[in-house]
Amino acid sequence: MLWQAWDDVYIVYQPSSAETHVFNETTALILKCLEDGPLSADKVKGQTEAALGVGPGELAKEDFAFATMRLEELGLIESLDETLAIQ
Amino acid sequence: MIVGDLSRRELGERLAGDGLALQFGPFNLRIRSNLDSFSGLAHRLYEPYPLPDAEAISDFHVQISAPRGLRRWARRQACFGVDGQFPFAPYAVEHAFPALEWGINWCVATRAHHLLLLHSAGVERDGQAILFPASPGDGKSTLCTALVHSGWRLLSDEFGLVRPEDGMLLPLPRLIPLKNESIEVIRKFRPEAVIGPSFLETRKGTVAHVRPPLDSIRRAQEPARPRWFVFPRWVPNAPLTFEPLPKSQAFLMVATNAFNYEVLDGTAFRLVSDMVRFCDSYSLIYSDLDEAVNTLDELSQAGDG
């Protein structure tokens, strides 16, 4: 994937679909966490919180779930049992 | 050699024979036509455009001709063709000239995928270019025409041709088709502008073509570096507003406005990202051309410092 960050907006180019996506910081950071390989959902959430500079558990579960669902819908990530991975 | 070096008769013979080879910026065209009315107007409006070298390969073989068969007797029509195909319904023969001009734009927009094609006017001064990405009706051609008659060089009124190798803009200083009220606006703004006849009731309303200043045509092989994106919108009686745009918004407006962003894949993403990173972006709402030109002059002068 190709990335371009401006302010708190991330623009991501997805070669597999030739689509360009616009993400907020939370969604983009979730995706970035998974660039090096699959991680459990809890670890992704924890790393995202750290990257956002908020404390453990401060990222609302609903917000995290919504962002991962959106990424999955776009075909950018997939759920592997208990883990998340970039497709 | 330029078109003006040919007599009207020589031009007509070329158009009716093997075709008139013509160079428009990075493209070589071969134009054929058996219509006398087209030949006369082409001689006048294409007069300063260069003819390519004899051995140059034509990128597009286009024609604007009377249809064959019974149709030619039923109604006087003109058909636009490219490489032997006729992609559009016939036009009234009176609209042959604008039909060919639109057809050439269509060829560029659908075939020149070795370049990133932004739907944008562009002008240059002192080596720095402004791109005006806009939708039809936003006034980009009118503004562009005013600027190129106020000291700016025309790159194109329709295409931002971005060379992938270095991100430079390639000029395509073709005739500028003004529509409806814009024709009279420019006649008043610059009475000395060379404007062809008005074609009434075309598929886009009344259309008249402005010939770019000679300097723009002569420097058609001189690329320019993009420096600003200005997203114009003409709003009747509106006070001028000129405001910076966030880069993320500019990126989306440029990318969604390109003719072939999807075709060029990651190359387009990289090119648009690089351009938006380097360029300052603004939205411009205007109703008065003098005010708009002054604002862009000031922008250019500030950019020099």
What kind of region is each of these model predictions?
Chain B
Residues L45-P48:
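Short Gly/aromatic-enriched secondary-structure transition segments
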